[in-house]
Regions:
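Short, charged, surface-exposed hinge/linker loops at domain edges
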Residues: 484-494
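Compositionally biased regions
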Residues: 7, 402-405, 483-485
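A short N-terminal helical cap/helix-turn-helix that marks the beginning
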Residues: 476-479
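Short hydrophobic beta-strand that contains or immediately precedes a catalytic carboxylate
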Residues: 447-448
Length: 494
């Protein structure tokens, strides 16, 4: 069992052990609202995810990773800044208009390490645009991502759900299309596809071409084309963000037809719960009937299958290109969603379906395929990529929070974390060590023994008070340390 020692010693060990040579390229593939139990590599026999599964076969799979925020904006902005939601006071999507000016981000740190940084796809980062001059909203968002977040090149959209609202309102209010509200919307308008997009709206399925016109197919094509033309001497960090499998689940029909009620996973029945679950854990109760859950899951699984195809297009390009042996591929979701389990749909809760980000890191040249059971945090990726990039110990120590995953990836040195992952929604936090999850609800504290209750239905706090007390202490210490350290303001310089 790995013992835990200081981060400084870990960095020394890794620096001595790694081979000399140019640092690798780094490709992030981030998807939206993906629940790990719908992937074959996480045990779903019914799944149609061969491309992600293949990536897992060649990579390191983190069985017990957790996200820090349980909605898109909190999770993504926590990751890019290495700050927790409580540091940012960001628990729900609309809590914060923008991050503090000049905030630290790991892409800015990668730029200082000589990386070319590229953003492609859906954007839920909220950079501060104060003082930035731009000709239209797209230009402003692009420049803010470049200046405040640390990206040299940007192609981004707000995502399908926001886009429908933007396009509908603009056409209804203005009567004609004004370019510059959203880059993907402009693409649809220029190619006479906007009317089709808006007529379909939230309906199912989409008739747009899946690989060139549908949002994620278009993002994938953009990413591949940028890589195909990449001739820079410096290594690249590319962050590709898919909108799928986020609602409204409008994947092309051939993907949804793959699924029937026979191959649906069983629903975790809320009647199995032995305690009154606090309302904070059930923000969106399931409406209507079991049929609602079936239709919801069928469309969701179709969106996942479509997402998998786009992941495959991207990884196939990498594997058949000059980048094959020198690119680290990191696959993950910002969080998962509830699909009827515990009587809940959606997110913003602390059940495992939402908290596991399906984290996979593949770099066969250096990291042997394996499964890691140590609990880690998605926020750990900040220090991890800087470690992979060969950044100095001082640079890595300046990262506000988290621990490098490199010692787990290459089995050299010792992991600096304590094997506990922390997550938060407004007013409620959880501590998870792989075997147990403690939820620090002010009125109803909860302890799940995941060894005997993987579905999280039985509160065993009274039966195992010592375990609960231990995780409560760890949670309080984490909150104190992450809140009191002066570097946690996020305003430290790069």
């Amino acid at each position: 069992m790995k013992r835990f020692i200081s981060l400084a010693f870990i960095i020394i060990c890794w620096s001595c052990a790694r081979e000399e040579g140019p640092p690798p390229n780094i490709l992030f593939i981030e998807v939206d609202d993906l629940t790990a139990k719908y992937l074959g590599c996480f045990g779903a026999e019914f799944a149609k995810t061969p491309c992600v599964d293949e990536l897992a076969t060649s990579g390191v799979v983190f069985n017990n990773a957790v996200v820090q925020g349980a909605m898109c904006t909190p999770s993504r902005n926590s990751l890019v800044t290495s700050l927790y939601p409580h540091n940012l006071n960001l628990y729900e999507n609309l809590d914060l208009k923008s991050l503090p000016k000049g905030i630290w981000t790991f892409p800015k740190a990668l730029q200082k390490e000589g990386y070319k940084t590229i953003w492609v796809g859906k954007n839920h980062l909220i950079p501060n645009s104060l003082g930035i001059r731009a000709k239209n909203p797209v230009d402003l968002r692009n420049k803010a991502l470049q200046i405040e977040m640390g990206f040299d090149e940007v192609f981004q959209s707000l995502g399908r759900s926001f886009l429908i609202e933007i396009a509908s309102k603009q056409l209804n209010d203005e009567g004609c299309w004004e370019m510059g509200k959203d880059a993907y919307a402009d693409f649809l308008f220029e190619n006479n596809l906007l009317d089709t997009f808006l007529q379909e709206g939230y309906t199912f399925p989409s008739s747009l071409d899946p690989n060139s016109e549908y949002m994620d197919g278009y993002f994938t094509s953009i990413a591949i084309e940028k890589l195909r033309k990449y001739e820079e001497k410096e290594p690249f960090f590319m962050w590709v963000n898919f909108s799928e499998p986020h609602a409204p689940f409008t994947a092309p029909s051939e993907y949804t037809r793959m699924f029937s009620e026979k191959n649906m996973p069983e629903v975790i029945d809320p009647d199995c719960e032995n305690f009154n679950v606090p309302k904070e854990l059930k923000p969106n109760p399931v409406p209507e009937t079991v049929k609602t859950v079936f239709n919801y899951r069928k469309r969701y699984m179709g969106s996942i299958a479509y997402m998998d195809t786009q992941v495959g297009r991207l990884t196939d390009f990498i594997n058949t290109s000059e980048f094959r042996d020198n690119t680290v591929v990191v696959f993950f979701s910002d969080h998962g969603i509830m699909t009827g389990d515990h009587g809940v749909l959606g997110k913003n809760t602390l059940y495992k379906e939402v908290l596991n980000p399906s984290l996979i890191i593949s770099y066969p040249k250096e990291y042997e395929a394996q499964r890691i059971v140590t609990a880690v945090e998605l926020l750990d990726l900040g220090k991890t990529v800087l470690d992979i990039a060969g950044a100095s110990g001082e640079t890595i120590n300046n990262v506000p929070n988290g621990n490098s995953l490199v010692p787990l990836l290459n089995d050299q040195g010792l992991f600096g974390g304590n094997g506990i992952g922390f997550s938060e929604i407004r007013g409620v936090r959880s501590a998870f060590n792989g075997d147990y999850k403690y939820i620090d609800h002010p009125k109803t504290p909860i302890l799940f023994n995941l060894k005997i209750d993987p579905d999280e239905t039985l509160n065993v706090l009274e039966k195992e008070p010592k375990v609960a007390a231990s995780l409560k202490i760890a949670l309080d210490q984490w909150l104190l340390m992450s809140a009191s350290n002066p570097d946690k303001t996020g305003n430290n310089t790069n």
